[in-house]
Structures are given as C-alpha cells and as structure tokens.
Amino acid sequence: MKHRLYSEGLSISNDLNSIIGQQSTMDTDIEIDEDDIMELLNILTELGCDVDFDENFSDIADDILESLIEQDV
C-alpha cells in the first residue's frame, strides 16, 4: 500500500508525485517490520507525540505527521 504524504507545516515537497513517478532500478515498495514500527512509536511517545493507529498501521504516517505538527517539532 502506498501512502502519499503532504504537510505544509513540515514543508514536505509539493513535487512528491514526480519523485514517486521517477523510474528507478530499485524496487520502490518499502516493507517495514512491525517491531521497527513499534520502536518508532516508542521514540515518538518519548518525544511527546501522541500517535494513534489501527492494527494494520494503515494511517500511521498521517498520524505521525499530524502529531509532529501539533508538537511544533
């Protein structure tokens, strides 16, 4: 599943679609182990970010960005 991330508060590139669309010799799909996600969530919690997600982690990227914007990190 691909997520498109946009955040004016974090100045993420508006040209993300062209970056995603670029041809590459590497596989663009990224698989992240559930343990790595939990470690990231623990770090964000220690930094004071409140990140909620469902059991499939489908909305985790949006929740992280929203939490970081709220924290002014």
Swiss-Prot record:
Any one Gene Ontology molecular-function term assigned to this protein's record: protein sequestering activity
Identification of the protein by name: Protein OPG058
GO CC, alphabetical: host cell nucleus
Lineage, uppermost ranks: Viruses, Varidnaviria, Bamfordvirae, Nucleocytoviricota, Pokkesviricetes
Signal peptide coordinates: none
Induction profile: Expressed in the early phase of the viral replicative cycle.
UniProt cross-references to Pfam families, sorted A to Z: Orthopox_F14
InterPro entries: Orthopox_F14
Keywords noted in UniProt: Early protein
UniProt entry tagged with the keyword Metal-binding: no
Family to which this protein belongs: Belongs to the orthopoxvirus OPG058 family.
Gene: OPG058
Any one GO BP annotation for this protein: symbiont-mediated suppression of host NF-kappaB cascade
Domain of life per record: Viruses
